Each structure stands twice: as structure tokens, then as C-alpha cells.
Amino acid sequence: MKIYRYLLVWAIALAFATAAFSQDVKTDYDHHANFERYHTYYWQSVKTDDPLWQSRVQDAVDHALQAKGWQRVDSNGDVAVGAVGAVHNQREYQTFYDGFGGWRWGGFGREATTTVQNYQIGTVVVDLYDTQSKSLIWRGSASDTLSSKPEKNENKLDKAVDKMFKDFPPNK
């Protein structure tokens, strides 16, 4: 019976943990920038801990910007694009209390089970700079839990960048 309770606690913890971690995508922009005058862009830099992810981030952003009608050029574009990707470790503690609390006689079965879950969070930040004024005109960021499978993480990256650029260029 104790093993059943232990497995149930783990199943509940896993269900809550999975539901709690979803993509967090945010965007912000310079409200004075005239996005109608921007048509070309070039890559200034892409920095990630893993060199394989540099081209993946670049490809995802290229796809999103080109879908909006922007054209990539080698240099001297209207906008310079920079991106940074990072991974950090996260730990979550969840405690479940078994048994029933007592009113008068102290209850019974008071056991607590604490589970620790370690996971990694991946974050990507994309910045767009006006090349004339050298000022930041748009920023998008996304964070999500990472899988142990690179193809799943690449799919998450593509979805995150699509969400970032969903309402791009911003309306005034």
C-alpha cells in the first residue's frame, strides 16, 4: 500500500510539474519607432552556449522576419538583429501531505513526502536595432523547459519565435 501511495505522489507531482512549465513569450518595442520604414535586416550577432544552436536561432528568426516581408541582407540593412540564448538549471520542491489531520485526537497517518525535480530552462532573447539611430526598437524573449531530445527543443524554439513575431510589426 505504501508503494502505491508513493507512486501516486510521483504521478501527481509530474502532472503538476508538466502543467506548470509552459512557454513564456514576451515582446516590447519602442512606441516611437516607425516600423513601416524597415524592410531589410542583417545579423549582428547570435550568442549561445552551444554553437549548434546559433544557426537554429538564426534560422527561426529568419523564417519569422521573412514571413513578414522583410529581406535579409549581408550588411547595411535597415535593422540589425542580435540574439542571445542561454540555459540555466532550476530546481522545484513539492511536498505532499498524506493522511488526515485530527481535530481532537491528533489525526492519523501524518506523513509528508517531498520530491525534488531538477530541470533546465532555455531562454532566447531577440533584439532589433535601428541602424541609423543605433537604438533598440524591438525585443522578444521566450523561456521554456528543455527536453533531453534536441529535436523537441528545436521544435519549441520554432514555436517560441513564431509566438514572438505573431503580432510583428507592432501596431501603433
Regions from the PLM with identified roles:
Residues 1-6:
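Positively charged n-region of N-terminal signal peptides that target proteins for export
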Residues 7-19:
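Bacterial N-terminal signal peptides
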Residues 21-68, 76-79, 83-85, 89-92, ...:
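A structural "domain/chain start" motif
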Residues 22-33, 116-123, 130-138, 143-172:
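C-terminal/domain-edge helix-coil "capping" segments
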Residues 37-39, 72-77, 128-135:
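A short, structured loop/turn motif at beta-sheet edges
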Residues 67-72, 149:
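Short helix-to-loop capping/linker segments positioned immediately adjacent to catalytic or ligand/cofactor-binding
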Residues 68, 83-135, 143:
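Surface-exposed short loop/turn segments
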